[in-house]
């Protein structure tokens, strides 16, 4: 064939287009096979029982289906013909695409044979590679087509529906049906078709021999050759890494195996006639048990080849070779690849370390980086496909590698280095192209003996393009584009490889060598990312997810491999590379796989890291707990006993010797590994993996590993804080707030110390967790310490205080437990003193304290509701008492008519206990707030001081609400005002409500003398209170009055004065009582009057003096003191 014809045939362009088209068709066949093999995604009518007879008929008669005379068989198809057409059009067109692809492939292969093209991977690399790729892609398409079990039904049913709808079958059906029948036994038909192409195919494959032998060496040979080592020869470290066949150095061995196995499978004739072909074929058979057709679809090399050759005459020796090779693979390949992986781990780690330290070496040694990536990818893919498919083996350890994560991590490390230092690579290779390659190419062109015009124009353009390059283009961030140059070189390879070409490439190897070098250098300027994908793409994991997950699980079990575990989420970013524009429907599924597995891997890593952090926190908390003051009692006791002679020399039996804090640091031998050591080691490894990358992308989603860790840490810290509280709903036990605070501080202190190592925002994690603990429920809907402590204080401490087993001691500023048998299991003072209230405020914060206050106020208002009911029941009598309280005779007849007076006092005391507890909690909050925010506390207190009785009530309440949130005490409690305001009143008018409030104070005032009869109403100087908590009445009277009269917009002072007068009269009348039982604790009760005045800012001692002589109070104090000392 003439040279002009070679130009016209456009072999390079057709190979490029058909290879890309072939990949698309192959993926479509894969997608159809995958869809039809899964009942969930299979076309619905293929699963319908009513359609079964039609499907059997179509399958049996295919392709000769008589649609018009088969209505009884095809009735269901006729009913659903429109739906079938709609659903199967894509499937049918995909099969038509296969047929058209086949036609174009054979046309091109025949043209190449007619041109008598010469193939040599070392010279015309692109031409040879594209030729072999096309053969393998075409074979894979046909093999996959034959593996689609429903192919006849899909094609036949579509054609039947088409004929029913349009009156005639699809024009392509006849040829398509015939093609499907021909490829029922695909390899037999393919070998027949490829017989004429044996010379070209075998020639191309034989050019691989030297390269394949060199790339198929074992780890020992690699080691002795110092493969990938930059430091084995220091003087040559900056010399450019060149080769006569640059692209061959990082060409995948898996790709070569596919070429050789499938090539000799189709053109097997040369195996008996050519010893070189036979040697190459046998060597390749000893490499793998399986080769990949596409994704997880594989060809079982030895079985398929043996089955084919066994059916052919004269191939007995080849069958024996196959069996021998299979035995060799089973016996040796696992160990062979295991040793190569071990070598690569060491060699690539060294390479990465050197390049990271001296990134400038990426210029001259860029080839080493891509070789390393290609070698790792080959070993990983070999392991994956054999682990997936080799199910029965005597040596399962050959197909499992617990250190695979390190290899994946190194692959990602090299990729990251190349991307990070892309400018270094570009600057070096731009100068190489402009100052060396262009000059050498120019010299070679001038020395060519023959150079046709077309070739001359192309090569001259090469020199021109390369000579025009300058460094400013890199500095200015200019985008380079050399795809045109590389396509021209591809064309030139085609032109110079035909038999009758004036310029033969194999006669001018120097031209091929320099052009292959130029192609690599040009790719370093504009296609580094594509080259990274070509050499290191591991998207195969997207289709071997079970193996992927298994490898990840094995990595987590090896503590030494934990630091490399981040490689698995990073590999998920590769999945985007397995998509193809001819099969867009795959994209969402692949995206889901990538994101789901990336998410699950990071979730597991974050979970493991947070577990490790929290375990160490728990250990730290245990150490911190040993330093609590309560543990020093034993030490003090022992020290005291040493001074006495009675101390025993030996400890009592059953009393274990308690280790002193710090004993855990004493170690006789450093080889002794403690649990803390193991945890710290694991945490170090996990921190390295979680902190390896700040972010990366998976299918256009940006992933931040630190966010996974932050969310897990936050959730775990929330649960840990609640666990530290030790709340037991059955026994109503809970940890003291001060002890919980010490534990929380131990946790927080350790997490803060890890901030710079974990990569997570430790401050944010702590802030969020602690903030959530100030709410009733956390972000997961679980109870927080705010809820637990609120419930405990209400249900345990305050309930017992209401029943009289716990009293408020103003002297101790705490609630105190009274010594009674079997009624309580905790000491009230340990949970309510100043330090505990401060710790509670520190833990719950302003929000938590507000929640606590709201719950307290709910209980207060429920008591107020009951009090109002009692007032309403006695309203008529109370109205008379209010008018006649100064008339003893009338009062003597009215007072006995009151009902529920003791109940009123009891409920008011409960309110007082609750409000007293709230006041103590508020004081704790004020101290904490002053400590944390003194610059805020000052202005708040100053603002409160500006409030006067004349200030608008809304403004007053707003200021008091602000002050109350900071823990500052107020004359009017805004929380109580709001709680009472929220009570749903009945139909009574505001005037009636106000009247009830006034009468409530009257009811209380006239009921006070009843307290004198209670033996518990004795005033204790030691506790500065009463054993029945009636001293809390004063707070209840003042706070409730202030809230009620604020709500009704009345003068608080006036009504409190009225209360003082009525109460004074009632107590003075008690002095005239002759019954000693009724006056038993008269003096103690009299002291309540002074307590009321001290509690209120609205009342003064002068006001009290006007209605209750101070001499009585003085006498009462003296009597109480005398009685206390006598007792």
Swiss-Prot record:
Coiled coil: none annotated. It comes from the Eukaryota. Keywords: Cell membrane, Cytoplasm, Disease variant, Membrane, Transmembrane, Transmembrane helix. InterPro entries: Nck-associated_protein-1 (IPR019137). Expressed only in cells of hematopoietic origin. Expressed in neutrophils (at protein level). Expressed in T-cells (at protein level). GO terms for molecular function: GTPase activator activity; protein kinase activator activity; protein-containing complex binding; TORC2 complex binding. One of its GO terms (cellular component) is ficolin-1-rich granule membrane. Residues 652-666 have a biased composition (Basic and acidic residues). GO terms for biological process: actin polymerization-dependent cell motility; B cell homeostasis; B cell receptor signaling pathway; cell migration; cell morphogenesis; cell projection assembly; chemotaxis; cortical actin cytoskeleton organization. It is a single-pass membrane protein. Residues 639-651 have a biased composition (Basic residues). It is found in: Cell membrane; Cytoplasm. The chain crosses the membrane at residues 996-1016. Residues 638-670 are annotated as: Disordered. Belongs to the HEM-1/HEM-2 family. It is linked to Immunodeficiency 72 with autoinflammation and lymphoproliferation: An autosomal recessive immunologic disorder characterized by onset in the first year of life, recurrent bacterial and viral skin infections, severe respiratory tract infections leading to pneumonia and bronchiectasis, and poor specific antibody responses. Patients also exhibit atopic and inflammatory disease alongside chronic hepatosplenomegaly, lymphoproliferation and lymphadenopathy, and autoimmune manifestations. In hematopoietic cells, component of the WAVE2 complex composed of ABI1, CYFIP1/SRA1, NCKAP1L/HEM1 and WASF2/WAVE2. Interacts with ARHGAP4, PIK3C3/VPS34 and PPP1R12A/MYPT1. Interacts with mammalian target of rapamycin complex 2 (mTORC2) components, including MTOR and RICTOR. Essential hematopoietic-specific regulator of the actin cytoskeleton. Controls lymphocyte development, activation, proliferation and homeostasis, erythrocyte membrane stability, as well as phagocytosis and migration by neutrophils and macrophages. Component of the WAVE2 complex which signals downstream of RAC to stimulate F-actin polymerization. Required for stabilization and/or translation of the WAVE2 complex proteins in hematopoietic cells. Within the WAVE2 complex, enables the cortical actin network to restrain excessive degranulation and granule release by T-cells. This is Nck-associated protein 1-like. It comes from Homo sapiens (Human). The gene is NCKAP1L.
């Amino acid at each position: 064939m003439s040279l002009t014809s070679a130009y016209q045939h456009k072999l390079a362009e057709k190979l490029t287009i058909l290879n890309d088209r072939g990949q698309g068709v192959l993926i479509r066949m894969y997608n159809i096979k995958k869809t039809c093999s899964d009942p969930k995604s299979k076309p619905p009518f293929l699963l319908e029982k009513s359609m079964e007879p039609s499907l059997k008929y179509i399958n049996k008669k295919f392709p000769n289906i008589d649609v018009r005379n088969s209505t009884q068989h095809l009735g269901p198809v006729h009913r659903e013909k429109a739906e079938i057409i709609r659903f199967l059009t894509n499937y049918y067109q995909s099969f038509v695409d296969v047929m058209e692809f086949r036609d174009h492939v054979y046309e091109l292969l025949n043209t190449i044979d007619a041109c008598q093209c010469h193939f040599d991977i070392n010279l015309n690399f692109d031409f040879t590679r594209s030729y072999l790729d096309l053969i393998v892609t075409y074979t894979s398409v046909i093999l996959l087509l034959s593996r689609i079990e429903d192919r006849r039904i899909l094609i036949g049913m579509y054609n039947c529906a088409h004929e029913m709808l349009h009156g005639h079958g699809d024009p392509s059906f006849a040829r398509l049906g015939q093609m499907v029948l021909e490829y029922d036994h695909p390899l037999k038909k393919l070998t027949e078709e490829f017989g004429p192409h044996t010379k070209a195919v075998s020639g191309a494959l034989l050019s691989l021999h030297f390269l394949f032998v060199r790339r198929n060496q074992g780890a020992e040979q690699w080691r002795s050759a110092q493969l990938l080592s930059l430091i084995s020869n220091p003087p040559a470290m900056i010399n450019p890494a060149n080769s006569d066949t640059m692209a061959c150095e990082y060409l995948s061995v898996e790709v070569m195996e596919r070429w050789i196995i499938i090539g000799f499978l189709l053109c097997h004739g040369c195996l008996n006639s050519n010893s070189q072909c036979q040697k190459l074929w046998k060597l390749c058979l000893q490499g793998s048990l399986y080769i990949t057709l596409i994704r997880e679809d594989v060809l079982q090399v030895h079985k398929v080849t043996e089955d084919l050759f066994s059916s052919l005459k004269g191939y007995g020796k080849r069958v024996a070779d196959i069996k021998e090779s299979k035995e060799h693979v089973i016996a040796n390949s696992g160990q062979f690849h295991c040793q190569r992986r071990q070598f690569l781990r060491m060699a690539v780690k060294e390479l990465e370390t050197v390049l990271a330290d001296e990134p400038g070496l990426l210029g001259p040694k860029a080839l080493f980086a891509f070789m390393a990536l290609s070698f790792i990818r080959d070993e990983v893919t070999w392991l994956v496909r054999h682990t997936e498919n080799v199910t029965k083996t005597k040596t399962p350890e050959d197909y499992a590698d617990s250190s695979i994560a390190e290899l994946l991590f190194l692959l990602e490390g090299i990729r990251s280095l190349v991307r990070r230092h892309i400018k270094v690579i570009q600057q070096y290779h731009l100068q190489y192209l402009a100052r060396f390659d262009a000059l050498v190419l120019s010299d070679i062109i001038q020395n060519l003996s023959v150079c046709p015009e077309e070739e001359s124009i192309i090569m001259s353009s090469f020199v021109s393009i390369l000579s025009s390059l300058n460094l400013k283009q890199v500095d200015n961030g200019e985008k380079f584009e050399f795809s045109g140059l590389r396509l021209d070189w591809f064309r030139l390879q085609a032109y110079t490889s035909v038999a009758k070409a004036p310029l033969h490439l194999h006669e001018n190897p120097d031209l091929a060598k320099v052009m292959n070098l130029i192609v690599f250098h040009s790719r370093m300027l504009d296609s580094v990312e594509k080259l990274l994908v070509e050499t290191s793409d591991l998207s195969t994991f997207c289709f071997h997810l079970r193996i992927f997950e298994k490898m990840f699980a094995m990595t987590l079990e090896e503590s030494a491999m934990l630091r490399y575990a981040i490689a698995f989420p990073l590999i998920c970013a590769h999945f985007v590379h397995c998509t193809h524009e001819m099969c867009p429907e795959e994209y969402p599924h692949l995206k889901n796989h990538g994101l789901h597995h990336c998410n699950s891997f990071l979730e597991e890593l974050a979970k493991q890291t947070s577990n490790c952090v929290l375990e160490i926190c728990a250990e730290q908390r245990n150490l911190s707990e040993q330093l609590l003051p309560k543990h020093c009692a034993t030490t003090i006791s022992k020290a005291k006993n040493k001074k006495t002679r009675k101390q025993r020399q030996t400890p009592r039996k059953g009393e274990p010797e308690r280790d002193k804090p710090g004993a855990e640091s004493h170690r006789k031998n450093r080889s002794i590994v403690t649990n803390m050591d193991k945890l710290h080691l694991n945490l170090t490894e996990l921190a390295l993996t979680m902190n390896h990358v700040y972010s990366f992308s998976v299918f256009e989603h940006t992933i931040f590993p630190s966010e996974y860790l932050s969310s897990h840490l936050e959730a775990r810290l929330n649960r840990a804080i609640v666990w530290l509280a030790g709340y037991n709903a059955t026994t109503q036990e809970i940890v003291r707030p001060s002890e919980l605070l010490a534990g929380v501080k131990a946790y927080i202190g350790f997490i803060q110390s890890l901030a710079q190592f974990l990569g997570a925002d430790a401050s944010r994690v702590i802030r969020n967790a602690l903030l959530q603990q100030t709410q009733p429920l956390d972000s997961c809907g679980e109870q927080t310490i705010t809820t637990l402590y609120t419930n405990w204080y209400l249900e345990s401490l305050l309930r017992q205080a209401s029943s009289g087993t716990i009293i408020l001691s103003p002297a101790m500023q705490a609630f105190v437990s009274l010594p009674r048998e079997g009624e309580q299991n905790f000491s009230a003072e340990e949970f309510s003193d100043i330090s505990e209230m401060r710790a509670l405020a520190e833990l719950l914060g302003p929000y938590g304290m507000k929640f606590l206050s709201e719950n307290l106020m709910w209980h207060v208002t429920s008591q107020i509701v009951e009090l109002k009911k009692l007032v309403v029941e006695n309203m008529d009598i109370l109205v008379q008492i209010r008018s006649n309280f100064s008339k003893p005779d009338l009062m003597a007849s009215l007072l006995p008519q009151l009902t529920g007076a003791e109940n009123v006092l009891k409920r008011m005391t409960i309110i007082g206990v609750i409000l007293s507890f709230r006041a103590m909690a508020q004081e704790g909050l004020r101290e904490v707030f002053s400590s944390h925010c003194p610059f805020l506390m000052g202005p708040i207190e100053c603002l409160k001081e500006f409030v006067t009785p004349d200030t608008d009530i809304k403004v007053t309440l707003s200021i008091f609400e602000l002050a109350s949130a900071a823990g500052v005490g107020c004359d009017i409690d805004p929380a109580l005002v709001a709680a009472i305001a929220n009570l749903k009143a009945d139909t009574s008018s505001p005037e009636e409500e106000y009247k009830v409030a006034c009468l409530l104070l009257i009811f209380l005032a006239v009921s006070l003398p009843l307290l004198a009869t209670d033996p518990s109403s004795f005033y204790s100087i030691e506790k500065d209170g009463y054993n029945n908590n009636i001293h809390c009445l004063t707070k209840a009277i003042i706070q409730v009055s202030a809230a009620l009269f604020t709500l009704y917009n009345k003068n608080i002072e006036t009504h409190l004065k009225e209360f003082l007068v009525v109460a004074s009269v009632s107590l003075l009348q008690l002095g005239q009582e002759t019954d000693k039982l009724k006056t038993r604790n008269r003096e103690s009760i009299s002291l309540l009057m002074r307590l009321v005045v001290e509690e209120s800012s609205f009342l003064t001692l002068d006001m009290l003096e006007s209605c209750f002589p101070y001499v009585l109070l003085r006498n009462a104090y003296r009597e109480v003191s005398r009685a206390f000392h006598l007792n």
